[in-house]
């Protein structure tokens, strides 16, 4: 690449360079993209990472790859044991300084105090002398050498272990500083396992400087991250999650105020490196990798964040409740119409003959169609198993046959209006003796007798007005759903959230949109259907 092109690429905004950087870092790694994304975000925001998982799953390789993200970064890596000494981590003592000046100084070149990227494997096996000094280094980014304090240039600390710190081990303070906690396991997918076996296992030696992170811009970003806004709606979601954690996991997952503050800064960094100047709901999903303490709390937190992605992030639960409210109003209106218009049988005062059951369908006011009577289905429905797509609006029955019908489960011969094909229809009465026909799904569809006298306009008009109002309310909800979905679409090109989590949000919008469209269609059909019941 010509020098000028390389320089132009290096100066490109970081959110444009990061996809290339992540792609380069992940080359040859399988099912480790989430760990790389989260590790890089922690590196970019100056936080620490804890990798938890069994041996031999590329924890150290990920740490080495993350080191390559920084241009000319100094790297320190060490495998802790119970016998590790501070000299092996922080540098040996200077014999010369001790002899000549009587000073207790360490030679730190090549050791942790002068490294930008640090990887400490089997971290919990280190002794108290190492861990106490490390805790100070993480907290203050300072290292005391002799009688003076020296700044530590550490940008990223990656620790790893195949176990969690034991309870009451005195390691809680250090563990609390490991903000990003990543659970790793063996490669699971067959194709990835095959590709891993076929690969040579060689890691990158170098990345082009054009995609790497340079020291001066890294320092600038730290100030810009702090200027990212946290909108009130996102704060409310955070507070809601905090309340939920306190109520459900208070005994197994204590989250300190310091940890909350650092986690919020991490999501601000996520917003910044995605090219935004304020936090978005999707950024909050990163809490799933910051707030758990052990395996049980991790599982519970994942369930909470799954619920968050489906219900809360983009007001899905609020819109679902509004949709349910509209459904209830529509259901009540349909019940009101059915009670007023549905043909109602009555009990006979006395009866004769073997078939009499004391029930009579009043047909005296039926509009005359020769020897036939017409019934409108209050809601058009599929009644013919041979043609399930065809919706029947009106059924025709022989008056004489209908007058001898009784509700014993026997089918009655009839046919759809305009279709000479006879069918057998199962009529039923509800508890209030209102007449219904069973559709193919055996749902009860109210039947409205076509009478001589039309339905009074004073009866139809309020129903029409109520349906018009329902349509308007559904339209407002549809606009809000569209607004929230557009907001999500602007956010979903996310560098640090896996596709699985984005799909959950997408699925929730799909269900909401589908159900709302169906409700609007049903209301519109009823709005058009009511005047036809007089035909």
Predicted regions and their residues:
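Conserved C-terminal "switch" segment of AAA+ ATPases
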Residues: 4-15, 28-29, 182-255, 276-277
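Canonical AAA+ ATPase core
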Residues: 96-101, 117, 122-130, 138-212
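Terminal-proximal interaction/regulatory segments of ATP-powered molecular machines
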Residues: 299-535
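C-terminal helical "lid" subdomain and adjoining coupling/linker elements of P-loop NTPases
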Residues: 227-229, 243-314
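Pre-Walker A (pre-P-loop) alpha-helix and adjacent loop at the N terminus of AAA/AAA+ ATPase modules
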Residues: 11-54
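Walker A/P-loop
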Residues: 40-82
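Conserved alpha-helical scaffold flanking the Walker A/P-loop in AAA+ ATPase domains
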Residues: 38-41, 95-118
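Conserved NTP-binding/hydrolysis module of P-loop NTPases
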Residues: 81-100
């Amino acid at each position: 690449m010509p020098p000028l092109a390389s320089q132009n690429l290096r100066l490109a905004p970081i959110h444009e360079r990061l996809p290339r950087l992540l792609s380069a870092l992940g080359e040859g790694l399988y099912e480790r993209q989430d760990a790389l994304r989260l590790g890089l975000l922690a590196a970019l925001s100056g936080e620490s990472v804890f990798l938890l998982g069994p041996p031999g799953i590329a924890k150290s390789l990920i740490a080495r790859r993350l080191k390559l993200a920084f241009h000319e970064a100094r790297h320190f890596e060490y495998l802790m044991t119970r016998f590790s000494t501070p000299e092996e981590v922080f540098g040996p003592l200077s014999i010369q300084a001790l002899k000549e000046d009587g000073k207790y100084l360490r030679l730190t070149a090549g050791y942790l105090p002068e490294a930008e990227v640090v990887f400490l494997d089997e971290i919990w096996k280190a002794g108290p002398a190492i861990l106490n000094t490390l805790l100070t280094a993480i907290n203050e980014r300072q290292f005391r050498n002799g009688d003076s304090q020296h700044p530590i240039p550490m940008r990223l600390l990656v620790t790893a272990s195949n176990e969690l710190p034991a309870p009451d081990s005195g390691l809680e303070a250090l563990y609390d500083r490991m903000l990003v906690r990543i659970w790793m396991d063996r490669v699971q997918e067959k194709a990835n396992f095959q590709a891993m076996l076929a690969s040579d296992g060689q890691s990158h030696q170098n990345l082009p400087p054009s995609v790497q992170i340079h020291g001066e811009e890294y320092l600038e970003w730290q100030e810009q991250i702090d200027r990212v806004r946290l909108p009130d709606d996102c704060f409310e979601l955070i507070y809601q999650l905090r309340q939920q954690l306190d109520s459900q996991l208070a005994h197994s997952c204590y989250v300190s105020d310091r940890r909350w503050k650092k986690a919020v800064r991490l999501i601000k960094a996520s917003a910044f490196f995605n090219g935004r100047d304020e936090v978005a709901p999707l950024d909050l999903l990163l809490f799933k990798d910051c707030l758990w303490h052990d395996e049980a709390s991790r599982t519970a937190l994942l369930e909470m964040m799954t619920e968050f992605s489906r219900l809360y992030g983009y007001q899905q639960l609020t819109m679902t409740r509004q949709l349910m409210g509209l459904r209830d109003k529509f259901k009540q209106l349909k019940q009101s119409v059915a009670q007023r218009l549905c043909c109602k049988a009555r009990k006979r005062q006395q009866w004769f003959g073997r078939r009499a059951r004391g029930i009579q369908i009043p047909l005296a006011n039926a509009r005359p169609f020769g020897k036939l009577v017409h019934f409108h289905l209050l809601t058009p429905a599929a009644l013919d198993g041979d043609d399930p797509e065809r919706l029947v609006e009106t059924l025709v029955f022989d008056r004489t046959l209908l007058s001898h019908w009784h509700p014993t489960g026997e089918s009655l011969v009839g046919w759809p209006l305009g279709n000479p094909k006879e069918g057998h229809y199962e009529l039923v009465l509800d508890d209030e003796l209102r007449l219904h026909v069973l559709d193919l799904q055996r749902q009860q569809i109210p039947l409205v007798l076509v009478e001589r006298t039309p339905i009074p306009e004073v009866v139809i008009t309020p129903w029409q007005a109520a349906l018009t109002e329902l349509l308007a309310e559904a339209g407002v909800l549809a606009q809000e759903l569209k607004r929230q979905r557009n907001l999500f679409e602007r956010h979903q090109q996310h560098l640090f959230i896996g596709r699985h989590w984005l799909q959950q949000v997408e699925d929730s919008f799909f269900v909401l949109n589908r159900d709302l469209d169906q409700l609007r269609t049903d209301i519109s059909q009823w709005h058009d259907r009511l005047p036809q019941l007089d035909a």
